[in-house]
């Protein structure tokens, strides 16, 4: 008890820390191609379920943890922790070192743990507590799921695919793949990384494949840009009425063998906006929307979303970021999604004095930006997402929403950014989705 009490008292005095939080597409890696296609980690060597158990309570803080053994064979690997469904805000502590403090319990997050790990047993703790920005959660909707479900550790070689940004765009009658792969080299000197990819059509026909040798300076991330034609295939443009998906698989090669497969599906075409309307492939979307949050399991959500689509619903409006598989379902069924950051203060929304509404309290601007950033990067490669919402309908407006809008417009060049509480101001592309 004394050791944990000491840790917690020390953390109370610390400023919010999130330096090791990783903002990127949500994915994990597989040892075998077939496993990646099935999303089956049973034969992935460096993938460990994270299911911490309660250790003790110190005041209003619940300490949960798990001991994880790091064998010598993992020394050339970066170890990441994916956390979701924490229910409460948390501090992440590894071997008595603070890794990150997270106020948003609704948005899944990844963390780089390698700087804090050692060979042998490692103690990974979460200190579950009340959020220091609880006012941002007043209008949030809880997902009724098992705590920590879907959390895991996984490892990637120190030369690895760190992230990717994939698009299939139409040029005339031709579809073109635009694939940007962020490659990370955590060795001290320049290394050549072999990066492979292949792409299959919605009819399961191999269209293109290649392995590129890509030099990356030591301790840096660089971007490999791939541009290739997929042919005159406008019949495969993705929409709610034509949910055709390509299959891309990325991997690295070491010692002549493919490693660390990442597989995902991608729809062709673009989501844009004009004159206050959402567009898919240049055509206005006739909106029939429904508020929806995935509160159960994949199979139950699949059945619920199918039922909604059968009634004519074509756009879902979640209240906060959803499990990654929710977006897979929507990609596959042809359901549009307006992705929404977990910014849901519903008190004092009309009080525009500084500090009146949380959205006009500059002390919270870092938290607003962190939530928008986490929302955007993890799901930006999903075709179903046609727009981004900065927060709830009663979130208010002000300095923090201005900054959030500016940041998101700086990274997202096509899809609409919506602030439904803009109240006639400049920081929204569309007033609201009905």
Q: Where are the regions a protein language model picked out?
A:
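Substrate-binding/catalytic cleft of secreted carbohydrate-active enzymes
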Residues: 315-434
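Secreted/periplasmic carbohydrate-active enzymes, especially glycoside hydrolases
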Residues: 1-10, 18-324, 328-332, 386-387, ...
């Amino acid at each position: 008890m004394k050791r944990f009490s000491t840790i917690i008292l020390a953390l109370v005095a610390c400023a919010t820390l999130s330096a090791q939080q990783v903002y990127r597409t949500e994915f994990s890696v597989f040892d075998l191609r077939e496993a990646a296609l099935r999303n089956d980690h049973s034969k992935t060597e460096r993938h460990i379920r994270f299911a911490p158990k309660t250790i003790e309570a110190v005041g209003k803080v619940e300490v949960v943890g798990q001991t994880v053994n790091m064998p010598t064979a993992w020394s050339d690997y970066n170890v990441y922790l994916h956390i979701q469904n924490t229910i409460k805000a948390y501090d992440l502590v590894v071997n008595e070192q603070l890794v990150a403090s997270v106020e948003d319990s609704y948005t899944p997050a990844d963390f780089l743990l390698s700087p804090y790990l050692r060979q042998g047993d490692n103690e990974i703790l979460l200190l579950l507590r009340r959020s220091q920005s609880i006012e941002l959660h007043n209008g949030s909707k809880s997902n009724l799921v098992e705590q920590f479900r879907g959390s895991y550790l996984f490892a990637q070689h120190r030369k690895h695919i760190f992230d990717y940004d994939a698009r299939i765009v139409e040029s005339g009658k031709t579809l073109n793949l635009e694939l940007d792969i962020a490659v990370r080299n955590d060795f001290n000197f320049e290394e050549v990384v072999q990066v492979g990819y292949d792409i299959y059509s919605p009819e399961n026909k191999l269209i293109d494949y290649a392995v590129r040798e890509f030099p990356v300076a030591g301790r840096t991330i660089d971007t490999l840009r791939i541009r290739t034609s997929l042919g005159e295939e406008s019949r495969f443009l993705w929409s709610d009425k034509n949910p055709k998906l390509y299959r891309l698989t990325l991997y690295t090669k070491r010692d002549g063998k493919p490693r660390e497969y990442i597989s995902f599906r991608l729809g062709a075409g673009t989501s844009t906006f004009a004159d206050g309307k959402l567009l898919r492939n240049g055509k206005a979307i006739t909106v029939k929307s429904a508020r929806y949050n995935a509160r159960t399991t994949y199979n139950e959500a699949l059945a619920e979303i199918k039922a909604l689509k059968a009634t004519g619903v074509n756009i879902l409006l979640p209240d906060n970021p959803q499990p990654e598989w929710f977006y897979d379902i929507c990609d596959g069924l042809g359901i549009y999604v307006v992705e929404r950051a977990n910014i849901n203060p519903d008190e004092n929304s009309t009080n525009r004095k500084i500090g009146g509404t949380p959205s006009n309290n500059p002390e919270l601007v870092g938290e607003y930006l962190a939530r928008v950033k986490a929302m955007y990067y993890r799901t930006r490669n999903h075709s179903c997402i046609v727009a981004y919402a900065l927060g709830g309908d009663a979130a208010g407006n002000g300095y923090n929403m201005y900054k959030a809008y500016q940041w998101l417009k700086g990274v997202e060049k096509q899809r609409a950014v919506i602030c439904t509480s803009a109240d006639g101001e400049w920081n929204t592309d569309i007033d609201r989705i009905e």
